[in-house]
């Protein structure tokens, strides 16, 4: 079941507010050196113009705080990997729910039941990963369905392709994201719907490369038909996922005809 009733509202102060507070504290403890006919004299006081940067920083922080706190955010939580926020929007008659980490979108899902299983963003049917998952040529005598690995869970969008007998293994480093997209208590329901269609879905909490490396050490290659890597946020590229050594790890997890 969707845990929409379990949203919790956390008012997070924008960094600008904290900067302003720090400036106020700093000003309060600045010692001014004033020279007069008696020589140097030190006393407590506010330096000339000290209020100006304080008021500017405080004003900017409060304006941004007010903007970010508008009603579209139904969930907000700060964690080790930044602020996770869920917003709800309506566009051209469609309602959808959006997951953001800072200012980076990690996927969205339509909220209406009829459209909630629709694969969105850059995972759609005409995209590279969409084509690979939809048209991978399974052997006629294959005993199981499609095996798909995903580095970076997001809202679980790729599970929208999962059918009966398929196996989807998702690797995600951020426990907040796992909680919001998991089968048991997820706000986003791609994984739950995949399970209801008869697919098996497992979420591995941890760094994708390290987790796959541990699986190889345990002699558990996954035999993925498709392995998709999308563990990237803005310009902070996790280079360790793109090295020659990491690619060698991925290839060992692929079926002989698998697609990376």
Please provide the spans of the model-predicted regions:
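Alpha-helical transmembrane segments of multi-pass membrane proteins
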Residues: 1-260
């Amino acid at each position: 079941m969707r845990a929409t009733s379990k949203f919790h509202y956390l008012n997070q102060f924008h960094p600008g507010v904290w900067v302003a507070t720090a400036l106020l504290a700093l000003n309060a403890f600045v010692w001014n050196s004033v020279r007069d006919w008696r020589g140097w004299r030190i006393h407590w006081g506010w330096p000339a113009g000290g209020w100006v940067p304080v008021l500017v920083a405080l004003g900017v922080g409060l304006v941004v705080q007010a903007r970010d706190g508008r009603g579209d955010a139904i969930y907000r939580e700060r964690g080790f990997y930044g602020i996770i926020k869920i917003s709800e929007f309506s566009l051209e008659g469609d309602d959808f729910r959006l997951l953001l980490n800072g200012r980076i979108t990690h996927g969205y899902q339509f909220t209406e039941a009829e459209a909630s299983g629709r694969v969105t963003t850059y995972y759609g049917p005409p995209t590279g990963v969409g084509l690979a998952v939809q048209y991978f040529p399974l052997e006629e005598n294959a005993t199981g369905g499609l095996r798909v690995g995903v580095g970076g869970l997001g809202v679980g969008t790729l599970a929208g392709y999962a059918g009966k007998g398929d196996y989807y293994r998702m690797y995600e480093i951020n426990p907040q994201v796992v909680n919001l997209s998991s089968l048991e208590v997820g706000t986003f329901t791609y994984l739950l719907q995949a399970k209801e269609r008869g697919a098996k879905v497992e979420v591995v909490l941890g760094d994708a490369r390290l987790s796959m490396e541990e699986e190889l050490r345990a002699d558990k290659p996954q035999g993925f038909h498709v392995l998709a890597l999308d563990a990237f946020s803005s310009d902070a590229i996790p280079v360790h996922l793109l090295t020659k050594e990491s690619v060698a790890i991925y290839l060992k997890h692929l079926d002989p005809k698998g697609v990376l």
